[in-house]
Amino acid sequence: MCWLRAWGQILLPVFLSLFLIQLLISFSENGFIHSPRNNQKPRDGNEEECAVKKSCQLCTEDKKCVWCSEEKACKKYCFPYFGCRFSSIYWLNCKVDMFGIMMLLLIAVLITGFVWYCCAYHFYLQDLNRNRVYFYGRRETVPIHDRSATVYDE
């Protein structure tokens, strides 16, 4: 049963992260309902700067802009609302879309977590076996006493 619990600890974060990414994608495809508190805000000059750019290469040179391939338009970068589907947004390059970047980030986090989990498990087993010795005649593991501990008799 211990292996089942270990797999549960590994797979639960994976499924939760996939669920959150799917939730984010579904929100970006359906759009958000925006209700700004103050509609009289002065417009940011960055929106016009992004709208002027007409190609993906020009748009992705600026870190404040994203390229929407569906509309073939450059828009201001505003996470998580971009104004177009999550799988058709390009930021900082024209080869990998935002969905691909998020998947690569998720894979990197999962691999880092798995390596950390393996290291922690290795050190746990190493610490567990430090105070045990295997007797070949008995074919069993027997705990040994700590000889470095001092006992004071008065």
From Swiss-Prot:
**Which is one Gene Ontology cellular component term of this protein?**
membrane
Give residue spans on the Cytoplasmic membrane side: 119-154
Q: Which residues lie on this side of the membrane: Extracellular?
A: 27-97
Transmembrane ranges, per UniProt, are: 98-118
The primary location reported for this protein is: membrane
**Highest taxon of the source?**
Eukaryota
What does UniProt give as the signal peptide span? 1-26
Q: Specify the protein's topology with respect to the membrane.
A: Single-pass type I membrane protein
Q: Which UniProt keywords apply?
A: Membrane, Signal, Transmembrane, Transmembrane helix
**Compartments in which it is found:** Membrane
Name assigned to this protein = PTTG1IP family member 2
Q: Which organism is it from?
A: Homo sapiens
